Curated annotation (Swiss-Prot):
It comes from Cupriavidus metallidurans (strain ATCC 43123 / DSM 2839 / NBRC 102507 / CH34). S-adenosyl-L-methionine binds at T69, D90, D116, A117. GO terms for biological process: aerobic respiration; menaquinone biosynthetic process; methylation. Its EC number is 2.1.1.163, 2.1.1.201. Pathway: Quinol/quinone metabolism; menaquinone biosynthesis; menaquinol from 1,4-dihydroxy-2-naphthoate: step 2/2; Cofactor biosynthesis; ubiquinone biosynthesis. NCBIfam families: MenG_MenH_UbiE (TIGR01934), PRK00216.1-1 (NF001240). The lineage of its organism: Bacteria, Pseudomonadati, Pseudomonadota, Betaproteobacteria, Burkholderiales. Methyltransferase required for the conversion of demethylmenaquinol (DMKH2) to menaquinol (MKH2) and the conversion of 2-polyprenyl-6-methoxy-1,4-benzoquinol (DDMQH2) to 2-polyprenyl-3-methyl-6-methoxy-1,4-benzoquinol (DMQH2). It catalyses: a 2-demethylmenaquinol + S-adenosyl-L-methionine = a menaquinol + S-adenosyl-L-homocysteine + H(+); a 2-methoxy-6-(all-trans-polyprenyl)benzene-1,4-diol + S-adenosyl-L-methionine = a 5-methoxy-2-methyl-3-(all-trans-polyprenyl)benzene-1,4-diol + S-adenosyl-L-homocysteine + H(+). It holds the Pfam family Ubie_methyltran. Keywords: Menaquinone biosynthesis, Methyltransferase, S-adenosyl-L-methionine, Transferase, Ubiquinone biosynthesis. This is Ubiquinone/menaquinone biosynthesis C-methyltransferase UbiE.
Length: 243
């Protein structure tokens, strides 16, 4: 049996999805509040930058994978308009329910679906854009998920990955203290769940750095892959294209 990482813990590949699901069932109801607290609201600016780089136009088709509470899908649905098609998807029922309800409360009606990024239930060459924000690091087979994302975009389309990455070296010690001391403390105080936020910190450290993710995207056939460091490399936006 093959092993993978759940944070720093080594687990059998067959166990990871269930463990990650447990984390997100636990944090779903406090997800937005905790995002604001953990990032000082910066996650909103990271998403604004991603939306600007996506440049969705009326009539386009967009797939938002691991879409969580729907921040990106909401913006894309407005940009694509009534002639477009924007799907909010997540592998986790609790997160998808929160995202769907949040969109409806904002007056945004768009299709939602449970979706495993390693087995995307859409035909080849269907979407103009596929996005995944803060979800890739939780996937068991990242290469398989990226290959699936490439499969479903049209020639000329883009895959965009917004994810925690490798912080600039002078900030590493401070970032470690914040990640392994402050985040679990916030998780306990606000969400009553320190272990889930300890996993968050560990999963960030185990995720490929900027250059490694570029190579991973290129290996599945994405081209002209580039990345943008945000907030000193705390987060990076990777963009790959299909021709």
């Amino acid at each position: 049996m093959s092993e993978t990482h759940f944070g720093f813990e080594k687990v059998d590949e067959s166990e990871k999805a269930g463990k990650v699901a447990g984390v997100f069932h636990s944090v779903a109801s406090k997800y937005d509040v905790m995002n604001d607290l953990m990032s000082g609201g910066m996650h909103r600016l990271w998403k604004v930058f991603t939306i600007a780089q996506a440049n969705v136009r009326p009539g386009q088709k967009v797939l938002d994978i691991a879409g969580g509470t729907g921040d990106l899908a909401k913006a894309f649905a407005k940009q694509a308009g009534p002639t477009g098609e924007v799907w909010l998807t997540d592998i986790n029922e609790s997160m998808l329910r929160v995202g769907r309800d949040r969109l409806l409360n904002k007056g945004v009606v768009t299709p939602v679906a449970l979706c495993d990024a390693e087995r995307i239930p859409f035909p080849d060459n269907y979407f103009d854009l596929v996005t995944v924000a803060f979800g890739l690091r939780n996937m068991t087979h990242k290469d398989a998920a990226l290959a699936e994302m490439r499969r479903v975009i049209k020639p000329g389309g883009k895959v965009m990955v917004l994810e925690f990455s490798k912080v600039w070296k002078p900030l590493e010690k401070f970032y470690d203290v914040y990640s392994f001391k402050v985040l679990p403390w916030l998780g306990e105080r606000v969400a009553g769940d320190a272990p889930s936020y300890r996993y968050l910190a560990e999963s960030i450290r185990m995720h490929p750095d900027q250059g490694s993710l570029v190579r991973m995207m290129e290996q599945v056939g994405l081209e002209q892959v580039e990345y943008f460091n945000l907030t000193a490399g705390v987060v990076a936006l990777h963009v790959g294209r299909k021709y």
